[in-house]
Amino acid sequence: MTAMNHIQRPAVMFVADSHFHLRPDPAEMRRRERFVELCRLAQRAGHLVLLGDIFDFWFDYPHFRLRGYEEVLQALDGVRAAGTAIHFVGGNHDIWAADYMHERYGCGIRPPRSLLVAGGSRVMLCHGDGMFKLDWAYGAFRTLVRARAGIAVAKSLHPEILFTLSTWLSGRSRCATRDEARVIESRAASWLAGQPAPGPVGNPNLMGRDLTEWDLAIIGHVHHGFSIHENGRTLAALPGWLDPLGYGVLQDGQWRQLDFDRDPTPDLATPR
């Protein structure tokens, strides 16, 4: 097949765990500036997947909205205006942003695990909290943010109290240590080994409905980038937009994890 006959599929970009704060410090301001540049790159892709914890704290109260993310939100406005589809998977820090993201960017309301058929693959999307890394504080916070009772309790709290709780938990948001990384990869390998081999690609109209039929699973949350292959499937974890500034690109069925500071800018000039 010649290059002229090869039909390229729109590229898909993935990013997770930037943990942007309402009150950023100078180091975060640089990460924000680079995120704005990433959004400019995403304007040339077919899809941009925000895989959770983009915002370190988000809660919509009935009478006011917390401010501090305007630069990030405006950068995403540019992505949507360029025709790139934005997908949002809420993390344990920003699950409550789902409704707002739907209203502003047209993102579908996705369950904790969902499928996206794009980039030449069947992709299972999941933030990843609760999968591999046992942490009682995260477990408690996850229960709070994802349960109806927890949301009701949160709405009864003064915003400053909820913000203080989130700030305390965000202090635990860092890159995984070497020892933690080994544990995470070991548990991830065990999880993947327990998944059956994927079936053949079926009716395109039904694809995306069966959560067992995926070729590539992409998660965030663990703040450690890796890829594991088993039984015809790949499990990939994004390192987070921390240090390094990690993101992923899926193009024509090929998955790549990249460092925005160090790796060459990928060619995403594919037809939509």
Each model region followed by its residue ranges:
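Short secondary-structure transition/capping segments
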Residues: Y61-H63, V89-Y100, G130-T143, H221, ...
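Active-site-proximal loop/helix segment associated with metal-binding centers of metalloenzymes
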Residues: G128-P198
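Conserved beta-sheet core of the metallophosphoesterase superfamily
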Residues: G106-P111, M124, D129, K133-F141, ...
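A short acidic, often aromatic-flanked loop/helix-cap motif at beta-alpha or helix-coil junctions
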Residues: L115-A118, D243, D263-T265
